[in-house]
Amino acid sequence: MSRLNPRQQEAVNYVGGPLLVLAGAGSGKTSVITRKIAHLIQNCGIRAQYIVAMTFTNKAAREMKERVGGLLRAGEGRGLTVCTFHNLGLNIIRKEHARLGYKPGFSIFDETDVKALMTDIMQKEYSGDDGVDEIKNMIGAWKNDLILPPEALENARNPKEQTAAIVYTHYQRTLKAFNAVDFDDLILLPVKLFQDHADILDKWQNKVRYLLVDEYQDTNASQYLLVKLLIGTRNQFTVVGDDDQSIYAWRGARPENLMLLKEDYPSLKVVMLEQNYRSTSRILRCANVLISNNPHEFEKQLWSEMGHGDEIRVIRCRNEDAEAERVAMEILSLHLRTDRPYSDFAILYRGNYQAKLIELKLQHHQIPYRLSGGNSFFGRQEVKDLMAYFRLIVNPDDDNAFLRVINVPRREIGSTTLEKLGNYATERKISMYAATDEIGLGEHLDSRFTDRLARFKRFMDKVREQCAGEDPISALRSMVMDIDYENWLRTNSSSDKAADYRMSNVWFLIEALKNTLEKDEDGDMTVEDAIGKLVLRDMLERQQEEEDGAEGVQMMTLHASKGLEFPYVFIMGMEEEILPHRSSIEADTIEEERRLAYVGITRARQTLAFTFAAKRKQYGEVIDCAPSRFLDELPPDDLAWEGNDDTPTEVKVVRGNSALADIRAMLKR
């Protein structure tokens, strides 16, 4: 989009106070944010180092930074901060760690670490870990709401909350002892720091002269307060959001934060972006009519100049197998007729469990696909091993990292030895790593085991010393060679080819660390800082990003589709108790499910189809399914219903298979 429309231009130019840009789906909000940053630097005299733009994903931050770079002259963007909320929080903690009582090089615990630590606490305190996931979620919710352990304990209303609050108390104490933080702490700790230390708050407010926040409807209580504290009394900010696309209440997001802005900033200006640059008028009318069933503080109507468009198809299928077969055949047929690449097609669904059947059908028809939510790069065992070594180098107090690497490769140090080492370290109030070469450990362990532990510590101390030198990357490469990790992989992989692939991931990780160090603009980043950034990237990018333009039908949940767009979209499982989800019906939170359907609809550029099954297997029984209430809320004149006649879907599928066999035979000539 080379030129801005009048509403977009208004949002870019306004710098007279607080601004809310209510940006509908596909309305060009990224263009507004990036042009506004350029406008602030080039026309308003605000230096880039005093501008901070925050979003929720690394991918969005990267795209934003690249687009801003294309608008600025050389050197104009130096010092500009475009990052995620959690990256900003990490930077604040890194710079203010002493005031928070942390040592340099603190660790960031990922989901696996957090669950392992909570499980350990529950087994010690309650002789079992039943309900650890529920307790983990409760503690996460408390942190998002800025509730610390004493307050959680005081306000516990039932035995379950009391148990969670006690675990929370032990958990925070242990985290601090490990010199570690978790993902939620990256927001909680900066907020508490700013609230308790006016001098630090003043320092950071002076660093942030203008603040921009994307996807504001996804902020939780702690993120809202972090923004409010950074803004202070200056009131120079632009937030961009869409109340109709708030679909993350389950992880603490509060769409009401958009309404709170009007109370907290009475002079707030609101600019609505309603022109859509993505979808046909018909698709947008369906989206507008559907979402109008939700109550609104801000009324908006999306419109476009992309043509009227085809009818929206609603396809009834006899059962879930026929539904999956129908979608696969529709995609194959459209691909053959239009010659459009498979990557132009998206299959969206409410839950990952729906993917298996359609995946099998796509495989059967030899249709390539990309399944979002697969194994992440950082989730691979070899990468987790090396990351644990990195973490131990950065933070010798990280017991979780120590326990992961002590026997990778095998060092003949058994669980009994480690248990005795752990008990000794707890008595001495030191880390397990620090305890490995203490003389007093000999009173608890045979000399064979103390020698092995001390040998490991000497080796790691040497690596740490080398990493503090001029070439830490070479030191890490040497470490991998010295522990003979490649041989360990060959012993523990299904084939030499698998071992080679896993080893290539190890070298790739070290190269990523090298790139992080080399890209540091300020030149003051240490290897510890670079590892901290990698650990954070691990958590922010749980799934490996697909390469651009990857061939294959895109399969993903409705939640994962947010922010994406495709020419052809199929939304499967449009049934009561699937969309809307059963739990939402029971909890009377239908509005969020409606927003989820709205997000799905507005992913489509040209063609949209809904499918649902008349019957579905559930717990071994065949049940009747009711079409989703959301289908009844759509404008009937824009819908074309199919599959309501008496012809069995299976017969149609056989006919379709026969026709496609003929086409394939013709193509092979």
Regions found by a protein language model. Give the residues of each.
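Conserved helicase C-terminal RecA-like lobe
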Residues: 157, 341, 355-367, 380, ...
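P-loop (Walker A) phosphate-binding loop of NTP-binding proteins
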Residues: 24-25, 56
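Acidic, low-complexity intrinsically disordered tails
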Residues: 1, 638-669
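Conserved P-loop NTPase-based nucleic-acid remodeling module centered on helicase motor cores
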Residues: 50-138, 151-155, 166, 259, ...
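Conserved SF1/SF2 helicase motif Ia
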Residues: 40-56, 339
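Conserved helicase NTPase motor core
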Residues: 2-13, 17-21, 32, 52-53, ...
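Walker A/P-loop NTP-binding motif
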Residues: 31-47, 63, 67, 228-230
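Helicase P-loop NTPase motor core
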Residues: 27-33, 97, 266-269, 274-368, ...
